[in-house]
Amino acid sequence: MSKIRIALLQLLSAGYDQLANQAKGMQYCRMAKQLGADIALFPEMWNIGYKLPDSALPDQVEYWQEHAIDRDSDFVNAFRKLAWDLDLAIGLTYLERWEAGPRDTLSLIDRHGEIRLTYAKVHTCDFDREINLTPGEYFYVSELDTAAGPLKVGAMICFDREFPESARILMLKGAELILTPNACELEANRIGQFRARAFENMLVVAMANYAIPQENGRSAAFDGIAFKETGSRDTCLVQADGHEGIYLAEFDLDLLRAYRLSEGWGNAYRKPERYGLLTSRSVEPPFVRRDARR
């Protein structure tokens, strides 16, 4: 069997109560495994429920910083043990302690309890409270051992998906699946944009958001296989409503790989020598923003 199931954990958090979030997260991972999942994905910054401070309030910033955790924390290690116990890969998200200031992080734990990659959000929302975060520097892809065989997995987080370069780089690094934790309103335009990331790179994208009322749910996954022999097809694997729950996305890895071998997107017909301007640091009106970090 080459089928892989991803459990999108569309949850409500307990805010800064990390022990409660840990217990609930572990409960839902167990439920996901019972549903046959190979991978469970949390929404963004699960350990504190995507809480962010007001930069103008130092006490609030300090309190928030105190809730950042290390990769070797009890919180992360509890999920590493759980992954091994359940034979389940887990995309775990948390506010990561970092020397320059906390980062918005995902660690992909394999079904043997080992961390395969740790990624920090590159495109922080500098126009809002995410200005308090330290942006990540790189995009990573790692080979994940699954029951269906090895799978190349990358990650991007929320605002990252609104930049085509994020998914493009991950595709160029070999990603077949991109895990995308989220914490914002998902409306038609953002979901359409996310669908396009799968289509243009011929890969699977899977996104987990918070449920109503913390966000509006609508977690989604798309497999990027836009055509079959008889014509166009819908790439949507799952589209959640707003309610809390586990939403399963299943895709056929062999079918995806066969499609990628024959179709014209991804890296098949690109002309990188024509794209030099994409790496320019220059910003001209109307896109100048005083709060933007480069």
Locate predicted features.
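Short polar catalytic/cofactor-binding loops
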Residues: 10-16
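A short C-terminal boundary segment appended to hydrolase-like catalytic domains
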Residues: 251-294
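Active-site catalytic loop in hydrolytic enzyme cores
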Residues: 81, 97-173, 182, 186-196, ...
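CN hydrolase (nitrilase-like) catalytic-core segments centered on the catalytic cysteine
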Residues: 68-90, 161-248, 256
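Cys-nucleophile CN-hydrolase/nitrilase-fold catalytic domain and related Cys-dependent amidase chemistry
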Residues: 18, 23-112, 184-201
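Extreme N-terminal starter segment of soluble prokaryotic enzymes
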Residues: 1-8
